[in-house]
Amino acid sequence: MKKSLLYLILFVAANMVGGAVALLLSRWEHFAEGTEVSMDGLGNLPVSIGVAMFCTYVVLVLLMWVLKLIPRPLFPRTDKSPWHAEVSAMAAVAFLAFALSLLIAPLHLSDGGMTEQFDAMKDNVLCLLLLTVVGPLVEELVFRAGVLRSLLQSRWHPLAAILTTAALFAVVHANPMQALPALVSGSLFGVLYYRSGNLRLPLMAHILNNTLAVLSMHFPEMESHLEAWPVLWQLLLGFALLCVSFFLVAQWWKKTPQRMVKQ
């Protein structure tokens, strides 16, 4: 349990440091000239956040490696699931992402301005790498290979450990629009990690999930077209895709033997 808290503390601290560095980068000319720093006109702040968080996360991974908080080897050699089972798992992630988008859109939840921030990041290479690769890697190291693994080793019931980790994963996303999908997708990533005993599959799933989100930012007309549908149609299609996702996860589960999470 104490080790789980350590992972969370390091993650929160890294995000706080990254945010502070981003603010410094975005207003550097004011600090350098000794003039008053205004919070107005922070148009370059999202990109500064992306670059700062990219660098901070790289440092966090190195620190976790030095402190031996990352499993070694990171991807242990185990008998892989049949390729078609893993394809089912990845398809489940894609269907789940679309389902959650349809089911949550009618709620009109606040995202705290995150959509605008991500939209501003989409053309910066480091920001794209942060959103699609580095971010998922760090979050999987912290929440699945970190918190979830520690809870399982502490003899927590697997379901309780998976749901607790997913809830923490949702909380750190800080706004309802992101937190609800994070709770559901985080549960799926936890199931993939628990059953396979390997970070490889949940990491691939997380990267796919975030990549789909980034692609949706590049093609906003697709989302606008779906949101123009009647709410009932959105909900029906969302629930249908959700059922397909659950079915595919069940198929993967049946074809994947239980493996112990490495201590």
Give the label of every model feature segment.
Residues 158-173, 207:
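Small-polar-interrupted transmembrane alpha-helices in polytopic inner-membrane proteins
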Residues 9-68, 85-89, 238:
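Alpha-helical transmembrane segments in multi-pass membrane proteins
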Residues 12-16, 20-27, 178-233:
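Functionally important transmembrane alpha-helices
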Residues 40, 44, 207-263:
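C-terminal membrane module of polytopic membrane proteins
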Residues 137-142, 146-147, 175, 188, ...:
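Active-site His/Glu-centered metal-binding helix of metallohydrolases
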Residues 138-164, 191-198:
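Membrane-interface helix/loop boundary segments of multi-pass membrane proteins
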Residues 5-9, 50, 86-91, 125-129, ...:
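Hydrophobic alpha-helical transmembrane segments
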Residues 31-46, 70-138, 149-154, 223, ...:
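Juxtamembrane helix-loop-helix connectors linking adjacent transmembrane helices
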